[in-house]
Amino acid sequence: MKFNVANPTTGCQKKLEIDDDQKLRAFFDKRLSQEVSGDALGEEFKGYVFKIMGGCDKQGFPMKQGVLTPGRVRLLLHRGTPCFRGHGRRTGERRRKSVRGCIVSPDLSVLNLVIVKKGVSDLPGLTDTEKPRMRGPKRASKIRKLFNLGKEDDVRKYVNTYRRTFTNKKGKKVSKAPKIQRLVTPLTLQRKRARIADKKKRIAKANSDAADYQKLLASRLKEQRDRRSESLAKKRSRLSSAPAKPVAA
């Protein structure tokens, strides 16, 4: 069985291959997220404590948390659940997929472990070297949280701590740092004020245009009523002034 062992404190990862069933027996019948002592794997792992994070069987089916079986089952999964990507599916569509249970069995080919507690001796490639993170946080609030900054502190100075320098394809030395997102600067505040002022101006213009239209509409309706009443008055006067027709005997 292969072991993918990761050390979050150093950022290193290493693949180990162990074929001895006596050593592997300590991991059998254990569940996902359960901690296992590494003493059974050998003297070099003495004192280490590993946490089981996942695994795959020989056919590539992954382990799923919450499925209490050591074998393989077919579950009706929807998009967003673990072990199912769901790309290209309709909204809300579910598919029946094969997954392994969360209990470790001899059928597994790969088991993913994370070092929870360091042991007595160093493991080469895992605990003796430290691999710095390539990318730090981009969001301003996350940078403040990382460096324990207040609202008054300038975040832009602290991004240079994880600015990386490298040589590009042309042979030039280039430095690169992430662009800070959601950064509040005097320019962004000025733009926000301009947006709000523009919105207020547009609302005032719309209200004045609506009032002018109502005035125009009222005057046009009044003119229409006046014309109609005038035409009716003319009609009545014409009818009253016309001579009466003689009645036939």
From Swiss-Prot:
PROSITE patterns: RIBOSOMAL_S6E (PS00578). Residues 219-249 are annotated as: Disordered. GO terms for cellular component: cytosolic ribosome; cytosolic small ribosomal subunit; plasma membrane; plasmodesma. Pfam families: Ribosomal_S6e. The lineage of its organism: Eukaryota, Viridiplantae, Streptophyta, Embryophyta, Tracheophyta. It comes from the Eukaryota. Ribosomal protein S6 is the major substrate of protein kinases in eukaryote ribosomes. This is Small ribosomal subunit protein eS6y. Keywords: Phosphoprotein, Ribonucleoprotein, Ribosomal protein. The keyword Nucleotide-binding does not apply. Residues 220-233 have a biased composition (Basic and acidic residues). InterPro entries: Ribosomal_eS6, Ribosomal_eS6-like, Ribosomal_eS6_CS. Belongs to the eukaryotic ribosomal protein eS6 family. The modification Phosphoserine is found at S237. Component of the 40S small ribosomal subunit. Plays an important role in controlling cell growth and proliferation through the selective translation of particular classes of mRNA. GO terms for biological process: translation. SMART domains: Ribosomal_S6e. GO terms for molecular function: mRNA binding; structural constituent of ribosome.
